[in-house]
A protein has these predicted regions:
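N-terminal helix-turn-helix/winged-helix DNA-binding helices
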Residues: 29-62, 77
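Short histidine/acidic/glycine/proline-rich micro-motifs that form metal-
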Residues: 10-13, 57-60, 87, 174-180
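Short beta->alpha connector loops
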Residues: 87-90, 112-117, 249
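Bacterial carbohydrate/catabolite-sensing allosteric modules
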Residues: 29-35, 72-80, 95-102, 108, ...
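DNA major-groove recognition helix of helix-turn-helix
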Residues: 8, 28
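Short conserved active-site loop signatures built around small residues
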Residues: 24
Length: 282
């Protein structure tokens, strides 16, 4: 029994054969063993003052701006932040959740994008404070700061219509039930064009499949989505006169593809994005 305990706790001052160690680990996995969370006495005090920030990645200034603001405000109240970039990988998110439940005594979690494990996170919110920042989701049972995707999309549509555009293309990262903001922006664009009397084909949509998306560099996921899809559209030919990126990073990719193919903005095409990150003013 003591040998099992030492192997499971990864003691370094003892020696066991690889076969013995593997048998213990396999048995623990089969039985669903989980390392017990440290007691309050065992946990160093500073950990209880840490706020975990779950974000998809830090290459998009939208998220880094939020992280900076949250961290600055947390410091005002004596808290520190721990940023967990998941690259939108569910297994990475699960790792952080398990780490928090089993090893870290955190003060709370702030989600900057939709979790892939909503039932589990809903349950965790009964034990610690959790806040979500994003589109409204009635299935969330914890605190949420709602960020509308529909309203800015309507503003974009109204602006493009006022400039004389009658057909546009919306370019997005993969559309999914979890990432609702992507489809909400498209739906709002279509609805606004229809309200002005334009047909069903007024707004076309192009997005990468999850498989294509996963092949891209994690540091350039959104930018590369905009860049690759715009080049495909232009090579195929299009009657759209404007491109709308799901966010500013996608829009940057659209711009670079247009410039590379010698198109001028706004003379040949108009380009819009969302989020209003600082780089968008350059």
């Amino acid at each position: 029994q003591s040998a099992v305990s030492m192997i499971l706790n990864n003691k370094t001052n003892v020696s066991f054969s690889d076969s013995t160690r593997q048998k213990v680990l396999d048995a623990a996995k089969e039985l669903g063993y989980q390392k017990k969370k440290k007691s309050i006495e065992q946990t160093s005090k500073p950990l209880s003052k840490i706020i975990l920030i779950m974000c998809p990645f830090l290459s998009n200034h939208y998220y880094t701006t939020l992280v900076h603001s949250i961290t600055e405000r947390a410091h005002d109240y004596g808290y520190l932040t721990f940023v967990a970039p998941t690259l939108r990988n569910p297994s990475t998110e699960q790792y952080y959740l398990d780490l928090m439940k089993n090893d870290l005594d955190t003060a709370g979690i702030v989600y900057l994008y939709p979790t892939s494990f909503l039932p589990e996170v809903n349950d965790m919110s009964k034990q610690i404070p959790i806040v979500n920042i994003g589109d409204k989701n009635d299935e969330i049972t914890f605190d949420s700061i709602h960020v509308s995707s529909s309203k800015p999309a309507r503003l974009v549509a109204e602006h493009l219509i006022s400039l004389g555009h009658r057909k546009i293309t919306y370019i997005s990262t993969p559309i999914s039930d979890i990432e609702r903001s992507r489809s909400k922006r498209y739906d709002a664009l279509v609805a606004t064009f229809k309200e002005h009397g334009f047909g069903d084909d007024c707004v076309s949509i192009r997005s990468l499949s999850p498989g294509e998306y996963n092949l891209l560099s994690p540091n350039m996921l959104e930018y590369s989505s905009g860049y690759n899809l715009t080049k495909q559209i232009l090579e195929e030919g299009t009657d759209s006169t404007a491109f709308v990126g799901y966010n500013d990073m996608v829009a940057f990719g659209i711009l670079d593809a247009l410039y590379e193919l010698k198109y001028k903005v706004p003379n040949d095409f108009s380009v819009c994005g969302f989020d209003n990150i600082p780089m968008a003013d350059m």
